[in-house]
């Protein structure tokens, strides 16, 4: 009996220790996100916004390199919901990406738990809804991934941090805006710009009385890290703080060569970090401004967000006109001067100890080139649609990898053209069949009339070139093959192109889309399907235990009667029960 007990106890102890090691390898952070409607008046007009945990914008998701993140999302809306995490690479785990090509929507009154690791990442990002134009009503919030203690940041530790979530805003909610697009109308000029969910300070008589604005309190002489995210619908915004320099240090997970700017253009879907030193006198407060860019700024004057920077020893309120952007965009060529100065800090360590410049991307042979051309929206099959390479994407009813795993035929096509052709525009479920371990060049050619931001899920890419005109092979001679910035969202100017290089080392299905919400809603997107023909469980995770089913697989979905548990949380519970059982065995023996 004693020998049996000893053997059983030894087995259970070994199993428990192995389980503990597997769970303790990297820490966990857990969040509950309750997504619901909230009545607010950010521009003085009562309207329905989308809040997370009663907050608009939503709460900060704060993690550190390699942490496991668990986000339990409760959908209290009256329509399906998905949250996506632009820039978070979801290594081997496109099941958590939160777009229709990878996930079934969370039905109303249901919840779903996202579970992912921020593997080898640092930096500034945000989360937002990906369905039904919901981002136009909110549901967004910031993400910060901190360096591990053993990896130094390439600048002195700031005295504090400030987060700015900026974006254009309409006083109509997302459903009304969606109906306008569905009826074939363009949205027109926004009603304003919000800074952290608040309207503009009354800097002149054009701003209505009674609008709630933000004041940021700072200490003189201190240096703050300023994280700026443009979560808006379609408007590029110029960000500036009156009389203060912006020292650019990071964008979307990579440290930049440090450069000072008086003002900075932040395009839709982009995130940046700056260091700002409070080195001005305190005779008065200072304006913080986010204003529409690359438009007729006189006509678009109302599309301006204004907050206040308040020194603790300030002697009075700010007054007078707003500071104007000093960065010249009067000609197309000058408009590109700022983004071309954004380069990688090749000597800094990012998420790993090795310098960011140790990956010599400029010496790798390109295996495939994809030229993705956008056009102005047009009518296809009686509806207003937007296209890439003449195809307006229609999301499959069954997510791609679920269809693959369950042998669903005809869910999508792998025939997306690698360049634009002179063919009739069409609706289709056409996707890129990309090669695992390939090294591809993607050229975004913007033949639309507006500046656009393009994003690739699951990856960062090297921004090697941009120019006006039509891209051709000889343009590669002008590429930056040494210190191009690596990021996940890049602007493309109307009548111009931007070229990026991507190393395809992340198996899964990954969305390529325009971040301008109106164009995205109208179909300007596609997906890359990347599979490993020698898959052995090491390059792609299995579907999570709580996967949702829809489309051709909807009969597999069970009714949800309680909180959707995650495998991690279940694992912790099982480990706890195992330890209790082990204690009982020792006591019995």
Swiss-Prot record:
One of its GO terms (cellular component) is cytosol. Residues 328-349 have a biased composition (Polar residues). Residues 564-589 form a propeptide. Keywords: Cell membrane, Copper, Glycoprotein, GPI-anchor, Lipoprotein, Membrane, Metal-binding, Signal. It is a lipid-anchor; GPI-anchor. Its main location: membrane. InterPro entries: Cu-oxidase-like_N (IPR011707), Cu-oxidase_2nd (IPR001117), Cu-oxidase_C (IPR011706), Cu-oxidase_fam (IPR045087), Cupredoxin (IPR008972), CuRO_1_AAO-like (IPR034273), CuRO_2_AO-like (IPR034271), CuRO_3_AO-like (IPR034275). The keyword Ribonucleoprotein does not apply. It is found in: Cell membrane. Glycans are attached at residues 62, 111, 204, 243, 260, 296, 345, 365, 433, 447. It comes from Arabidopsis thaliana (Mouse-ear cress). Disulfide bonds: none annotated. A lipid is attached at residue 563 (GPI-anchor amidated serine). Its cofactor is Cu cation. Residues 322-356 are annotated as: Disordered. Cu cation binds at residue 455. Belongs to the multicopper oxidase family. GO terms for molecular function: copper ion binding; oxidoreductase activity. PANTHER family: MONOCOPPER OXIDASE-LIKE PROTEIN SKS1, MULTI-COPPER OXIDASE. Pfam families: Cu-oxidase (PF00394), Cu-oxidase_2 (PF07731), Cu-oxidase_3 (PF07732). This is Monocopper oxidase-like protein SKS1.
């Amino acid at each position: 009996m004693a020998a049996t007990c000893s053997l059983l106890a030894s087995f259970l102890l070994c199993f428990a220790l192995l389980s503990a090691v597997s769970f303790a390898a990297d820490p966990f952070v857990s969040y509950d996100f309750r997504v619901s409607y909230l009545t607010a008046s950010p521009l003085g007009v009562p309207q329905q916004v989308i809040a997370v945990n009663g907050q608009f914008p939503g709460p900060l998701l704060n993690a550190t390199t390699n942490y496991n993140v668990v986000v339990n999302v409760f959908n209290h809306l009256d329509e399906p919901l998905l949250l996506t995490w632009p820039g978070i690479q979801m290594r081997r785990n496109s099941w958590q990406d939160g777009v229709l090509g990878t996930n079934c929507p969370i039905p109303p009154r249901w919840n779903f738990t996202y579970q992912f690791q921020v593997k080898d990442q640092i930096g500034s990002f945000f989360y937002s809804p990906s369905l039904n134009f919901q981002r136009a009503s909110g549901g967004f919030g910031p993400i910060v991934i901190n360096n591990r203690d053993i990896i130094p940041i390439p600048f002195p530790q700031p005295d504090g941090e400030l987060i700015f979530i900026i974006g254009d805003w309409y006083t109509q909610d997302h459903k009304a805006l969606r109906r306008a697009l569905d009826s074939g109308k363009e949205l027109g000029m926004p009603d304003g710009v919000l800074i952290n969910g608040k309207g503009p300070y009354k800097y002149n008589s054009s701003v209505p009385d009674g609008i709630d604005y933000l004041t940021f309190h700072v200490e003189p002489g201190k240096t703050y890290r300023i994280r700026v995210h443009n979560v808006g619908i379609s408007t590029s915004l110029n960000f500036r703080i009156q009389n203060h320099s912006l020292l650019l240090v990071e964008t979307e997970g990579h440290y930049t060569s440090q450069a000072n700017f008086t003002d900075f253009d932040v395009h839709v879907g982009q995130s940046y970090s700056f260091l700002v030193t409070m080195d001005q006198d305190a005779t008065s407060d200072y304006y913080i401004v986010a204003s529409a860019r690359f438009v007729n700024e006189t006509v678009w004057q109302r599309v301006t967000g204004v907050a206040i920077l308040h020194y603790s020893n300030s002697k009075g309120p700010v007054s007078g006109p707003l500071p104007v952007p000093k960065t010249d965009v009067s000609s197309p060529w000058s408009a590109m001067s700022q983004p071309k100065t954004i380069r990688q800090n090749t000597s800094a360590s990012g998420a790993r100890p090795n310098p960011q410049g140790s990956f010599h991307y400029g010496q790798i042979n390109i295996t495939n080139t994809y030229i993705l051309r956008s056009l102005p929206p047009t009518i296809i099959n009686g509806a207003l649609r937007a296209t890439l390479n003449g195809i307006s994407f229609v999301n499959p009813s069954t997510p791609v990898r679920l269809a693959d795993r369950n042998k669903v035929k005809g869910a999508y096509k792998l025939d997306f053209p690698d360049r634009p052709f002179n063919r009739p525009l069409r609706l289709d479920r056409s996707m890129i069949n990309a090669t695992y371990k390939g090294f591809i060049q993607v050229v975004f050619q913007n033949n639309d009339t507006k500046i656009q931001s393009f994003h690739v899920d699951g990856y960062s890419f090297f921004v090697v070139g941009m120019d006006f005109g039509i891209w051709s092979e000889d343009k590669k001679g002008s590429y930056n093959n040494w210190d191009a910035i690596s990021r996940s969202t890049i602007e493309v100017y109307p009548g111009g192109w931007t070229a990026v290089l991507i190393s395809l080392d992340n198996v899964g299905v990954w969305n390529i889309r325009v971040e301008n919400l109106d164009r995205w809603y109208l179909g300007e997107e596609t997906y890359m399907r990347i599979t490993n023909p020698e898959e052995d469980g090491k390059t792609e995770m299995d579907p999570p235990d709580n996967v949702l089913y829809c489309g051709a697989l909807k009969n597999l979905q069970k009714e949800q009667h309680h909180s959707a548990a995650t495998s991690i949380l279940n694992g912790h519970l099982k480990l706890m029960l195992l330890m209790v059982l082990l204690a009982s065995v020792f006591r019995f023996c």
